Regions:
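Conserved beta-strand signature within the Rossmann-like core of class I S-adenosyl-L-methionine
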Residues: 163-166, 187-199
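A short, conserved alpha-helix within the catalytic core of class I
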Residues: 143-148, 171-183
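Short alpha-helix
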Residues: 221-245
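Core SAM-dependent methyltransferase catalytic element
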Residues: 244, 250-277
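Short "lid" loop at the C-terminus of a central beta-strand within the Rossmann-like core
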Residues: 169-172, 199-203
Length: 277
């Protein structure tokens, strides 16, 4: 498996930047290419928000996973739309955060990704080295196929709580996004959790909006940016953990020097975690 993944990685085109690697490049990680780093540098010439926002997003995801593992006792995670998954410091991984914060030794993580470049990179750099991690080719817009994937069905225990982190709602139109959230909340076992990350232009200064829109248009085809009210609508009826739907730096900050703490809206992303009854 490792040799095949590495061969596939070698055949990938790397001339164009993609958001799944830009996030890593902006956070100082190693799972990116020159095109991604060039775009981050170009964007930082306009505003330094790219690097700090990337840090804020990764720190949020790390806190969510850490809380669910350490406090809620979750030992199964499905991370949907993960790109090349990282933790808050360059090169660290979200499944490592789960393992380090869980009181148990057998935390299982399934990454689901549809972008072929991100998928192959993750398969080459994660699966060969981690027995309790799987990387699955899946598209949240094809819910039956994603949930019915043999790895998803057998690697995770669907009789026990699962934490699903939905990181790609920005790729869905309103009707599809509502359907996906509804399907996920009814598919997972009782006592599971649904975490959400969603990009927004709320709080983006008017003079920076064209640059932000331009970068995102280059890297996120089919982008659906939502306001706080629109994101809240996706979560309607769900029991949100405190502090509810907030800017990602505001979700259970744990001290230290969190990115975007002085201006949470500069993170450009909302986050929330819901308990599934």
């Amino acid at each position: 498996m490792r040799q095949r993944a590495v061969r596939n990685l070698a055949r990938l085109g790397t001339a164009h930047a993609r958001i799944t690697r830009i996030l890593d490049a902006a956070a100082g990680g190693k799972n990116n290419f020159l095109a991604d780093r060039d775009l981050v540098r170009h964007f930082d010439q306009v505003t330094p928000v790219a690097t700090t926002a990337a840090r804020a997003v990764l720190e949020y995801l790390s806190r969510v996973i850490g809380h669910l593992a350490a406090v809620e006792g979750v030992d199964q995670f499905m991370i949907v739309g993960s790109g090349v998954p990282n933790g808050p410091s360059g090169g660290s991984r979200l499944h490592e955060v789960a393992r380090l914060t869980s009181p148990g030794p057998d935390v299982r993580v399934v990454y689901v990704e549809s972008d072929p470049m991100a998928l192959t990179l993750a398969q080459a750099t994660i699966e060969p080295f981690c027995d309790l991690v799987r990387v699955v080719d899946g598209d949240v817009r094809e819910m039956d196929e994603m949930l019915g994937d043999p790895v998803v069905q057998t690697f995770l225990d669907w009789d026990r709580p699962i934490a699903v982190l939905l990181l790609s709602a920005h790729s869905l139109d309103d009707e599809c996004a509502r359907t996906v959230v509804k399907r996920l909340r009814h598919a997972v076992p009782e006592g599971s959790f649904l975490g959400l990350l969603h990009i927004t232009f709320d709080g983006v200064p008017g003079e920076l909006a064209p640059a932000v829109r331009g970068m995102l248009a280059m890297t996120l085809p089919g982008l659906n940016v939502r306001t706080r009210a629109e994101v809240a609508d996706l979560l309607d009826g769900l029991d949100l953990l405190e502090p509810g739907l907030v800017w990602v730096p505001e979700w259970r900050p744990d001290g230290g020097d969190p990115a975007c703490a002085d201006a949470p809206s500069s993170s450009g992303n909302y986050g929330a975690v819901a308990r599934i009854p």
